[in-house]
Every structure is written in structure tokens, then in C-alpha cells.
Amino acid sequence: MIRSILFPTDFSAVANSAFPLAVAIAAQFEATVHSIHISDGGDPHITETSRYEFPASPTGASAVRVIQQIIPKGDNDPAQVIMRDAEARGCDLIVMASHGRSDVGQFFLGRSVAEQVARDSKIPTIIARLYGPRRTTRPIDRFQRIVYATDLAESSKQILPLAASIAQRTKAKLEALCVFDEGDEEPADGGRATLERFFAEAGASELFGKIRRLHGGVGEAVVEHAGRHNADLVAMTTALCSSGNEGITDTAEFILRNAPCPVLCIRP
């Protein structure tokens, strides 16, 4: 259940472009969107009048409650400020773009910050890459197909309840994508029994259906699959294909940087 969503913005067009996604999800769950800007005290252009630069609610979304606030960065790392603020507000989800202003003095939603939030946040986070040659190409305010990427590890099921909840609310198709890295042994049943249990534990047995399987070169394969099948969201943990190692994996990082749609992830 999503009751509160954090949307960080640096007021740039790119950062604000992720706002419709936050609002679209909030509308489905009757959730509140907390739209925040992290102000650098050294920037004379950031004042209380800057709240007028916050993105306006999309047409038809006026019923969604949006709270706007400017908070000081101080000497803190922007990613840490975002994660700490999300926890303090009791947010269930963070939605942000992966690029904002490139000016050093005003830039805080760059790839490094977005990836740090995705890598370290215990709160589920949706990252939409909205800048560059491999930017998000699908509409980000609607859901018809959600891809749940799993390596069958117990940790990989942690993102499934939220992905399933979004699919249930939006009536999107939730597709299970079972991935096997080079050298991984595939179960005799292809992972069906494990996935059936994952979906049952997530309260989403009715969404479980056909399983797709990918072998080797997992990051590239997931990105290619998401593009070919017009996925609107990829859901995964940052430990995808980790083999027990801690931290974000190269596979998860590649998907986060190259997926043709927003990526929903969590640190397990």
C-alpha cells in the first residue's frame, strides 16, 4: 500500500518530467506526493518564491494532494538528504529522474545522486532516466506491462509486493522474468515452484502466469526484453545476480542506467 510518495526536484525540466509518474501512482493509491527541493544556501536564486517552479499537477490529477517544501542541503550529501527526508515523512516510495541541471552549483539530481538513492535506499525507489541517448522512451504516467526480474534468490522477492500492488491498481500485466547468469544452474521446473510461492506470499497469485527466462548477459538481456515488449516498468532488487555479495550488482546498475522505461528497485 502506498500512502506517501517523495518526489525530489531541482526545478529543471528533466527533473520535473518525472512528476507525472509520481502523481499517476499517487492517484491510484489516493496517496500524498511530497515534492521537495534541496536548496544550497549559497544559491541566491533559491528563495521562497522558487516554490512557483515546482511542477504543476497534470490535467485531471487535481484530486492528488501535493505538498511542496524547500529544505536546506547544508553540508550534507544530497542523496542522504533525500533518503533521510523520505524516512522522516514515512514515505512508501521515492520517484525521481536520473538527471537534472548540469550546472555544478545547482545540480543535485545527476546520475550519481539518483543511483546512490537507488543503491542505498531501504525505501522502494523508481528511477526514470530522462536524459541522454539511452533515456526512457516509454510514457511514464501509465502502466500496461510491468516486468519483474528475479534470479530466484529469496532477496529478489522483496520488490514483488509493491510491483504486484501497482499492477493490481493499474490493471497492468505483471510478467515474471527469470534470469540466469553464466554458470547458474536452472531448476528442473525453470523456477516455477519458487515463483508461485513468491507471488502467493505477495498476495498476487492471480497475477502469476507465463514465465520468461533469460540466460547469460542478464543486464543487456533484460534491457533488450523490456524494449522489445514495450515494458512500462522494470521491478528488481539492487542485488539481482549478486551471488550473495552485498551492494548494487553490475547487472542491476546496467539495467538502471539503460532500461527504456522507469525502474522500480530496492536494496534488500
Where would I find each of the regions flagged by the language model?
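Generic hydrophobic alpha-helical segments
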Residues: 22, 78-82, 163, 222
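Intrinsically disordered, low-complexity Ser/Thr-rich linker and spacer segments
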Residues: 132-144
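Residue-level marker for beta-strand->alpha-helix junctions and adjacent short loops that shape enzyme
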Residues: 12, 40, 75, 101-102, ...
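Short, well-ordered secondary-structure micro-motifs
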Residues: 45-46, 106-107, 137-138, 159, ...
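A short, acidic, amphipathic alpha-helical segment used as a generic capping/interface helix at domain edges
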Residues: 196-199, 217-227
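Charged docking surfaces used in two-component/phosphorelay signaling
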Residues: 70-79, 213-221
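Small/aliphatic-rich secondary-structure junction motif
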Residues: 1-52, 60-63, 141-190, 199-210, ...
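Gly/Ser-rich helix-loop-strand patches that form or flank binding pockets
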Residues: 83-135, 224-268
